[in-house]
Amino acid sequence: MSQRTESYLVGLVGDGVTPSLTPPMHEREGDVQGLRYLYRPIDLLELGLAGDSVGEVLRSARTLGFNGLNITHPCKQLVLQHLDEVSPDARRLGAVNTVVIRDGRFIGHNTDFSGFAAALASGLPGARLDRVVQLGAGGAGSAVAYALLSAGAKTLDLVDMDAERAAARAEELSGFFPDSTVTARTTADLPQLMPLADGLVHCTPVGMAAHPGVPLDLELLESRHWVADIVYRPIDTELVQGARAKGCDVLDGGRMAVGQAADAFRIFTGLDADPERMRSHFLELVAAEEVAA
């Protein structure tokens, strides 16, 4: 008697998601685990849809038998009003990037924060968290800050070009983590902050292929610092290269991308992904992109 192979249909909803590396990462892990796993980008720009159409996309996915969707810009906040249930951490963050469709209900999660937490634990085990400087307090930065504080960061200095945004984020996070100190800072404060810091986390677009450069003066880095970047295209950003040259322990952005994907895979399937196997495949995909370019 033949056994039926478990099958999954999932998608990625957002603007400009067609080139994303997330679908092939998921599909390869599904193949290795003996699943029929199909992951499709649902590019709102290509479809001529606005971000506020995400509710319609969710309902269509349910009708078509999707098991779940990953959600990215510009829909992570917009999707909240269409969900039946939201995990406590996603509710606190006010953003959802993973929706599982179960028994006709939409259940939201946030694997941005859990993906970074997993990356930090695996890529920088034992990193000191007495004081951390974080560059960028936007959407991704909020999730990373939440992960750092959840991991035990005692003092977190949020540095952002938008002082009001940094202040609002610091106040919000202080409410969630009353035993930690969260401060809003500006780039002008970095020369005073870095000598006091154990580590630096970078959460701005600087370093991406379209935004080359470094987000701070590399002379502020010391070999005792650890440095984490969430940019992964390219994987070796100028910050990562500069920090490595200074002798710092370094966490590249690919670790968070893989952590996000592994957590979403588990949410969709109920099966644990192998993060190191997924990272190996991720690095293959990035290398192939760089060769093609």
Curated annotation (Swiss-Prot):
Keywords: Amino-acid biosynthesis, Aromatic amino acid biosynthesis, NADP, Oxidoreductase. Its EC number is 1.1.1.25. Pathway: Metabolic intermediate biosynthesis; chorismate biosynthesis; chorismate from D-erythrose 4-phosphate and phosphoenolpyruvate: step 4/7. Signal peptide: none annotated. One of its GO terms (cellular component) is cytosol. Belongs to the shikimate dehydrogenase family. Involved in the biosynthesis of the chorismate, which leads to the biosynthesis of aromatic amino acids. Catalyzes the reversible NADPH linked reduction of 3-dehydroshikimate (DHSA) to yield shikimate (SA). This is Shikimate dehydrogenase (NADP(+)). It comes from Pseudarthrobacter chlorophenolicus (strain ATCC 700700 / DSM 12829 / CIP 107037 / JCM 12360 / KCTC 9906 / NCIMB 13794 / A6) (Arthrobacter chlorophenolicus).
